Amino acid sequence: MLRVLHTIEDVREQTREWRAAGSSIGCVMTMGALHEGHLSLVDAARRECDKVVLTLFVNPIQFGPSEDFDRYPRTEEADFRALRDRECDAVFAPATETIFPLGERRIDQVRTKVVVRGLTDVLCGPRRPGHFDGVTTEVLKMLHIVDCDRTYWGEKDYQQYAVIRAMVEDQGLPVKVVPCPTMRDVDGLALSSRNTYLDSGQRAIAPRLYAALRRGARRIAEQGIDVIGETTKQIAETLLAHGFDLVEYVEVYTGSLGPAVAGTPVEELRVFGAVRLGGARLLDNAAVADEVGG
């Protein structure tokens, strides 16, 4: 039976009870508007942990002033129904004031914030100033509240996963950060709550992002690191030709977000892309290792 919890005290009471019974705890953190990608994380936690908690919180401090906080989809009752079907044990759905009692609504208003340097200086970091600081500040707080053993993150938002993994390691937290494969629609589009922003014409274009990134990853797998510059340029040109409004970046990094330098094994590389299409900002990535020998 799904327990719906709204206060920090209720969550801590529940996790203490589970701990006393010797249960392990897995946590999936979301902003709601759940889809099969989120639910696959619940399934992964269910397989590996005795108890599963999902957090459902649209975190205001990870949004910039001109971003989509106000229109981000909120489907709480549908989310609860989906979690009951997946046999999730508890959902923590706090009010904004519960997590930020001082009235913080932007990262620059937060008294104590968590900054992961280096990993947030590439890819989405420069394009969304303060975004990752807002993510890590809220996630660290949730980890302290939920007291889980394992936390599960999708590889679609790979930079977010890498940043959270680094934060947990740097803080010495006794939590394992578990990456999970990106869930995709039948045409290859990565599942995302923001896909609802796309109209039918844009939805037909959107899968071409992953297709282009995969082709680039395959070329790097076949021809090596020396073709990265030419390959990323060609991907960006292809995406614009296919109808995307803006290509924010197409870049290649290692799985730990290090640079692709001479001597780096191609199997360690990923091709990352971010584009704008209508009112949606779409992210995806392709692992070169998946294309080796393909």
Curated annotation (Swiss-Prot):
Record's subcellular location: Cytoplasm
Residues engaged in binding (R)-pantoate: 62, 160
InterPro entries named in the record: Cyt_trans-like (IPR004821), Pantoate_ligase (IPR003721), Pantoate_ligase_C (IPR042176), Rossmann-like_a/b/a_fold (IPR014729)
Record pathway: Cofactor biosynthesis; (R)-pantothenate biosynthesis; (R)-pantothenate from (R)-pantoate and beta-alanine: step 1/1
CDD domains reported in the protein's UniProt record: PanC
Primary subcellular site in the record, as a coarse category: cytoplasm
GO cellular component, one term: cytosol
Domain of life assignment: Bacteria
GO MF annotations, alphabetized: ATP binding; pantoate-beta-alanine ligase activity
KW Membrane (keyword) present: no
Other remarks in the entry: The reaction proceeds by a bi uni uni bi ping pong mechanism.
Name of the protein in its database record: Pantothenate synthetase 3
